[in-house]
Amino acid sequence: MKILYPGTFDPLTNGHIDLIERAEKIFGNLVVAVLENTSKTPTFNLQRRIIQIKNSLSHLPNIEVISYSGLTVDCANELKANLILRGLRAMSDFEYELQIAHTNKSLNNDIETIFLSTNTNYSFLSSSLVKEVAKFGGEINHMVPPSVERDLKEYFK
């Protein structure tokens, strides 16, 4: 069974890492799929985000990191992944993620979406929030891994 954890990861946060570590314990392996979203202008380009993720997950040998563009369900089909993992911080996340899960299911009836609730330590955390704090010089060392912290400080210098 292949499990796909898709996202933009711009940037990767400690919340993402916690979810990946927990999923790896449950499922044994995971494919982290980094979206190249052409409708957004990311802070970090695709290659940089992949490097950040690989560096931050080097302690997890059963995690594969790939990139993709287009529909997540198409990426899952290409990988022959039948499960998509999503994290939920709040009820508002659930409403949005449920719509996406139903859409994916309508495009491929064999795809299932599994939701893991976020660790309460990271329930406030989002990539957008991290960038906002970093932009104004706030401390982000408890929000992101060290390599991402360095990259953000350099970016907003």
Swiss-Prot record:
Its main location: cytoplasm. It catalyses: (R)-4'-phosphopantetheine + ATP + H(+) = 3'-dephospho-CoA + diphosphate. One of its GO terms (cellular component) is cytoplasm. InterPro entries: Cyt_trans-like, PPAT, Rossmann-like_a/b/a_fold. It comes from the Bacteria. Its cofactor is Mg(2+). Substrate binds at T8, K40, T72, R86. It is found in: Cytoplasm. GO terms for biological process: coenzyme A biosynthetic process. ATP binds at T8, F9, H16, G87, L88, R89, E97, Y122, S123, F124, L125, S126, S127, S128. This is Phosphopantetheine adenylyltransferase. It comes from Prochlorococcus marinus (strain MIT 9215).
